[in-house]
Amino acid sequence: MASNNVGRVTQILGAVVDVQFDGELPFIQNALQTRIGDRTLILEVAQELGERTVRAIAMDSTDGLVRGAEVEDLGRPITVPVGPGTLGRILNVIGEPIDERGPVDAKKTYSIHREAPSFEEQAASAEILVTGIKVVDLLAPYLKGGKIGLFGGAGVGKTVLIQELINNIAKAHGGVSVFAGVGERTREGNDLYHEMIDAGVIKLGENTTEGSKVALVYGQMNEPPGARARVALSGLSIAEYFRDEEGQDVLFFVDNIFRFTQAGAEVSALLGRIPSAVGYQPTLATDMGALQERITSTKKGSITSVQAIYVPADDLTDPAPATSFAHLDATTVLNRAISEKGIYPAVDPLDSTSRSLDPRIVGEEHYKVARDVQRILQTYKSLQDIIAILGMDELSEEDKLTVARARKIERFMSQPFHVAEVFTGSPGVFVSIEDTVRSFKEIVEGKHDDLPEAAFLMVGTIEDARKKAEALKAKA
């Protein structure tokens, strides 16, 4: 172990630092350590330039670092503490606690760069993960041990949806959850921490967090690109410990995978690589694969991951979201046109897909209802041009009925969220899969053609829609 191998800083380019060693060069991905005043700065070796110099990425701000400063090779990659001691704590990319509650009580550390499980170790599941969110459970159901992506542009509700999933799944789920905040708002990270304390998912005692169910790993928007490009790996290492050593079913939430790619592009440019399409790093697919292939279920335990993925300029063909599509089992696409109608969650029922929408997994009835709902919505979509030009009166009676049902279905896909109660004033609802399938089946069959459209907006089950219709009638 080359722990006493010491070099000197020769060049500083923002987040990228060149270090010259007289002796042996450190390996790629090794951690280097230097002091800036009274703080320690960790760097990660990214390139070897010539015989004596390495180029490293800083995991924190390089303000105050000077040429000639001593840099020590730690002889190993960056490691993070793992195990029950991380639960209830907030860590940064290098595993240091940032919640001002003292050191982390961990018996073990894991490298943030680990091999993905081999083909023989992997295991597949065909069990549905119930989210309590109607549009998701009906049209693009999630699998236990699967990978789920929430795609959406700026401000269409990805973070609120991921927080609702944490609320509905993590609280009901007996196991452990890990949340990686990658390049998102610090305020949201803080809010999430306090919400989890209020919900009892994090239990804060005197110098202890015993009984907590979630570990938080943050590298937020204000961090340098090195930290944002690695923090998802740090969170994943903590999740892998619970999967591999304790055989648990772990929930792994990432907000936001796009920021991981964005940070990779920033670092890549600083390292002098020639960018590929739209200015992304040439190693985009490799970087994404290295992260995503580790998020999987094995014979020992499972990792179910929910990843928010920002879509730049609402363009799903942008290389960053397009690369992540290939790795996912279910995609929930949020659409600005739907959010503009005031329908939340703004999930696009025709764009969202799931591998598990299969009669062998969800059952014949669920599959048929989901396909009928999609057919009605697709017909409505294709009729919209005619309606815009000629108006509703020019449609056949059958088409008029289809449009009326489609508009009701569209509104019925909205529902009040628990985490949005403070904004909406409506109490959140959790709808079981049975109620979801039954309610949509009744709308498709025309049993509720007599109800006004407004009755279907922001309700839970079809019974709630009936009650709302009566209340609207009484008001009128």
Swiss-Prot record:
Subcellular location: Cell inner membrane
EC number: 7.1.2.2
GO CC terms: plasma membrane; proton-transporting ATP synthase complex
UniProt topology in membrane: Peripheral membrane protein
Keywords noted in UniProt: ATP synthesis, ATP-binding, Cell inner membrane, Cell membrane, CF(1), Hydrogen ion transport, Ion transport, Membrane, Nucleotide-binding, Translocase, Transport
Catalytic activity field: ATP + H2O + 4 H(+)(in) = ADP + phosphate + 5 H(+)(out)
PROSITE patterns in the cross-refs: ATPASE_ALPHA_BETA (PS00152)
Chief subcellular location: membrane
Binding annotation for ATP: 152-159
Enzyme class: translocase
Record Pfam families: ATP-synt_ab (PF00006), ATP-synt_ab_N (PF02874), ATP-synt_VA_C (PF22919)
GO molecular function list: ATP binding; ATP hydrolysis activity; proton-transporting ATP synthase activity, rotational mechanism
PANTHER family: ATP SYNTHASE, ATP SYNTHASE SUBUNIT BETA, MITOCHONDRIAL
Family to which this protein belongs: Belongs to the ATPase alpha/beta chains family.
Subunit structure: F-type ATPases have 2 components, CF(1) - the catalytic core - and CF(0) - the membrane proton channel. CF(1) has five subunits: alpha(3), beta(3), gamma(1), delta(1), epsilon(1). CF(0) has three main subunits: a(1), b(2) and c(9-12). The alpha and beta chains form an alternating ring which encloses part of the gamma chain. CF(1) is attached to CF(0) by a central stalk formed by the gamma and epsilon chains, while a peripheral stalk is formed by the delta and b chains.
Function noted in UniProt: Produces ATP from ADP in the presence of a proton gradient across the membrane. The catalytic sites are hosted primarily by the beta subunits.
Protein name: ATP synthase subunit beta
Species per Swiss-Prot/TrEMBL record: Granulibacter bethesdensis (strain ATCC BAA-1260 / CGDNIH1)
